[in-house]
Amino acid sequence: MQDLKGKVAVITGGAEGIGKAIAVAAAAEGMKLVLADIDADKLNNTVEELAGTGADVIGLRTDVSSESSVQALADAAFERFGNVHLLINNAGVALAKSAWETTQKDWEWVMGVNLYGVTNGLRAFIPRMLEKGEEGHIVNTASIAGLLSEPALAAYNVSKFGVVTLSEGLHHDLTLRKAKINVSVLCPGWVKTRIAEAERHREADQRTDFTKIDKVSVMTGMSIMKAVQNGIEPQQVASDVINAVKSNKFYILTHPHTKAGIQIRMEDILQERAPTLLPI
């Protein structure tokens, strides 16, 4: 989808971080925008900021883990603009715990946002996009943790591996139907966002009590937080996404050096050996 001008983009997690950066980049291409986020205040600020630059943009507070909330987002998008050409399933959360420390509520929260948030988006938008019959593109945000298993990120890893294989299967399903909709899966490494603070959106009694987490998980979590703080700017990721949409690129790897780790993982599998623990 090389010409984005006048096309409509829906972006979840669009109030800040990678989502906001993609929104800014899409607006610069002349796209109309529908932004969704759980944080209504930040969402309103971003919508006002973009509207101030001349962008045609609306925002809707959305809980992507809720099917009805995402369906309402789709209703609003199609009612306002008549079609959707670019769907960015981007909303995501994370927490640092080993598999045995991750509670059932933790699993439900992470999977609800990171994986079911994507499946809800696909169900709400794809049938209508197919019915319109126009050229389109879907970008699902996974992570390098969807290709490489990081320590102390049990639920996050599972959710992001899920997004990768979901996206691969989606590509096959749309190809078999000769649909005009292409797919990309975004697998960024460390990016300077607030994802390490994602638990701020949880109920207080469900947030991680770090006094009850073992020191290995705590130290690993601190290393991850530092890596995020030293990560690349979201604007670089947004540029990669726009370029991938225009060139119909499936895998979006924002950090080229991670390819070496992916190669090691493939070799581990082919050699049937234990997974190599890569540096954070």
Which stretches of residues belong to each language-model region?
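SDR active-site lid
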Residues: 176-251
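Canonical Rossmann dinucleotide-binding motif of NAD(H)/NADP(H)-dependent dehydrogenases/reductases
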Residues: 2-34
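Conserved glycine-rich Rossmann-like NAD(P)H-binding loop of the short-chain dehydrogenase/reductase
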Residues: 29-46
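Residue(s) in the substrate-gating loop at a strand-loop-helix junction
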Residues: 143
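Substrate-binding pocket helix/loop in short-chain dehydrogenase/reductase
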Residues: 98-99, 103-108
